[in-house]
Amino acid sequence: MKKRGLAIAVISAMLVATLGACGSGTTKTAGDSTAAQSQDSGSKQAANTEKSEVDNIIAQAQGMSLEELAKKAIEESNGKTFYGVGNSSRGKTALPLFISYLKTIDPNYNMEFEWQQPKNNKIFEQLSADSLKPSGTFAMTLIQDGNQIQTKMVDTNILKTFIPKDWAEANGVSADSYKGFLPLQTLNKVFMFNNTGDAKYTNCWDFVYEGSHPLFMDIDSELVGKNFLYMLTKEEYANNLKEAYDKLDATKKSYFDPVIAGVESDAKDLGLSENGKYALAWIKLWVENYTEEKDDGPICNTLVDTSAKDQSGLLVYSKLRSVEESANVSVNNITVAAYQDDYTGIGGYGYNHYLFLTKNSPLPWTACAFIAYITCTEDGFSAWGKDMGGYSSNPKVMEATEAKYQHQKGGYNEAGEDQFPAKDDRGYDWWTKDGELVLEDPQYCADVSFTVGNWIEMLSKASDKN
């Protein structure tokens, strides 16, 4: 307890420097697309640095159409090799489509490419090392984890944001006025449970109720999970947790009340809003009770099996696409919690894949053209858009993607029957409103990563107790 008290005291002292930033919000853009959640995220980029060649090219590129960028890319990269790096392997699928598009303009165009996907959070180390070269290896990156992007990549001027003109217009903004990161897509991790038993999960607090041990990727191995916990302390999401708590019965409230009371002073010390104590209580119970897994794939494989009676988890929604039906395994063995008519509270967590040029990009025009292609065309986004649970940040591309792949009827069979209702993706608008998806705000995560982050570090994970 002394260690805990001392740590809280240190955190409280640091709030003098950070409290003002912690209240920063996220500016909504027109069209209510995924751009909304990152509008303010890039506001702390190094403002007084001297403009580099890449900066100047980005400034020009932001006023160009995709076709104009494509012509610049052809001049720059014909006969060369393009290196990209990302958290998603699908850049490797998108690049051949991009090259095919450039060939429609110049049939003689040719470009080799290599796409790398570092494991175990090594992408930040790789980009940092590459930034030290006069001319880098990587032209661009597709990267996740808004907190580390903000603090390690943007505040240090390693990565550069390019906003395609067509993307900005689709979102009702201008490339020059938009100050956030550029999201390719929002991915959602959603609460699910095995429905072959008697357990009921009709409130987000049920996932942290007595005896519940949801399957979840460890917060120290996939850090977007830790960002989810940070975001719960933001006022709007803390309020959502309070509203869900209010709808619990007396028995469940009596279980949670001592925990809420126990963290009330911590919430005040951390400078959180009035309902911050509900967020801390939920976080504490989650961290101390979740069952640690290494990847969302095994979590999905467990939950869809009849042997996982009453088990629950928080995992990437799109994993349901890969389930192979058998006697004991079926998508119908799970329920997406938020799809229940009587469900209350947050339905999951939404995080982004962001696109950047490197500060020393060897092929900046080509990088800009590729970024514009995958954010402004349905074909370009198809490497990701072909599957459920990934939503383009461009509302026009989002609409075209749904029209082509019809994810909202993803569970329907050829006879027009809704065979697997859990695979009927209700889409970004539904998830962010009715589904109460918690959306990552990189700036907020960066602001509270020391204060709330250290508080979380003091908690004892269930895996540490075994």
Report residues per predicted region:
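Mature extracytoplasmic/periplasmic domains
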Residues: 353-437
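N-terminal low-complexity, Pro/Thr/Ser-rich intrinsically disordered segments
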Residues: 35-77, 260-263
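C-terminal motif of bacterial Sec signal peptides marking the signal peptidase cleavage site
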Residues: 17-21
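Bacterial signal peptide processing site
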Residues: 23-26
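Extracytoplasmic ligand-binding site segments that recognize negatively charged/polar headgroups
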Residues: 80-99, 113-126, 136-298
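Extracytoplasmic/periplasmic substrate-binding proteins
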Residues: 278, 288-360
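Conserved C-terminal helix/tail region of periplasmic/extracytoplasmic solute-binding proteins
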Residues: 51-56, 62, 67, 417-466
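Short, polar/charged alpha-helical segment
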Residues: 42-48, 66-77, 88-110, 323
